[in-house]
Amino acid sequence: MFKWYVVQVFTAQEKKVKKSLEDFKEASGMSDFIQQIILPSENVMEVKKGEHKIVEKYIWPGYLLVKMHLTDESWSYVKKTQGVVEFLGGGAPVALSEEEVKNILADLEEKKSGVVQKHKFEVGSQVKINDGVFVNFVGVVSEVFHDKGRLSVMVSIFGRETRVDDLEFWQVEEVVPGQESE
């Protein structure tokens, strides 16, 4: 019976491992045991220096989903593939439940159908400036221009609120509440 398993692979080698598993399953006679291999990813819109670029980002870096009939032979084949660390569950791989699979596949389908904005800055959120004249200043977002990948931030300079305009998304990072002093 085919079930879904989560396979841990070396980070940054997800595509390579997926391709290896797919390419060699035919040659090694594993196509009867391995049905499908998914690298969970989504399309993300990044804006750098005013240019919009859609890039593929892995939702679970270092993991693949493999739909397979688990036998000693198929387990060994996957485990011995270069770049594979282990099955989740360790020595005894644990299959995902039907409910987990349904939720994961629905989530992946939803994420693949659109493009996610990488930066979700909102007016009123706190950010730290990482580049430019005001580097290391912490301020509050006053305007967001998602179409241009830019925002404006209000910072306090000598006790006076000053607006810093035309910052690109990559020049700032969100500040987690309670960690402003880092």
Curated annotation (Swiss-Prot):
Q: Which GO terms describe its cellular component?
A: cytosol
User: What are the UniProt keywords, alphabetically?
Assistant: Transcription, Transcription antitermination, Transcription regulation, Transcription termination
Q: Which SMART domains match?
A: KOW (SM00739), NGN (SM00738)
S-S bonds: none
Give a yes or no for keyword Transcription in this entry.
yes
Listed Pfam families: NusG
Q: According to the UniProt entry, where is the signal peptide?
A: none
Q: Name one GO biological process term.
A: transcription elongation-coupled chromatin remodeling
Record family assignment: Belongs to the NusG family.
What job does the chain carry out?
Participates in transcription elongation, termination and antitermination.
- What is the protein's given name? Transcription termination/antitermination protein NusG
